[in-house]
């Protein structure tokens, strides 16, 4: 049985259980009509054997018994990261917090200014529309009333 998680999967799987599962899969696949398969299924099934030959992930890449020089570089980097997190972050976190809050307030102020400007434009447009309608009604009282009557008759 091939395993994908060698440190987690139990290598001592009962062979009878594995055979039973394979038998169930074959039984289900045999019950399906073969004309229902996609034309690429046989090619993919044939390629499955090639996957086992490729070997999967190269575990040697993660082996720590490698080049001593490289291990020293990695150790130095990890030590630097640990010191940075332990020593410097605790001293600078308050300043980082203040700077972040200032940026957030600045962005919020810019957004609010844009919203206020748009609201002012909408209010001015509404006032203009109201003034135009009032002026038109004063200069054309018969037309406006007739239009309103037609609309009322249409919807009532």
Curated annotation (Swiss-Prot):
Where, per UniProt, does this protein localize? Nucleus
Q: Does the keyword Nucleus apply?
A: yes
Q: Which cysteines are joined by disulfide bonds?
A: none
Q: Name one GO cellular component term.
A: spliceosomal complex
Provenance organism? Candida glabrata (strain ATCC 2001 / BCRC 20586 / JCM 3761 / NBRC 0622 / NRRL Y-65 / CBS 138)
Q: Name one GO biological process term.
A: mRNA processing
Q: What are the UniProt keywords, alphabetically?
A: mRNA processing, mRNA splicing, Nucleus, Spliceosome
Q: What does this protein do?
A: Involved in pre-mRNA splicing.
Relate the assembly described in the record: Associated with the spliceosome.
Protein's recorded name? Pre-mRNA-splicing factor SNT309
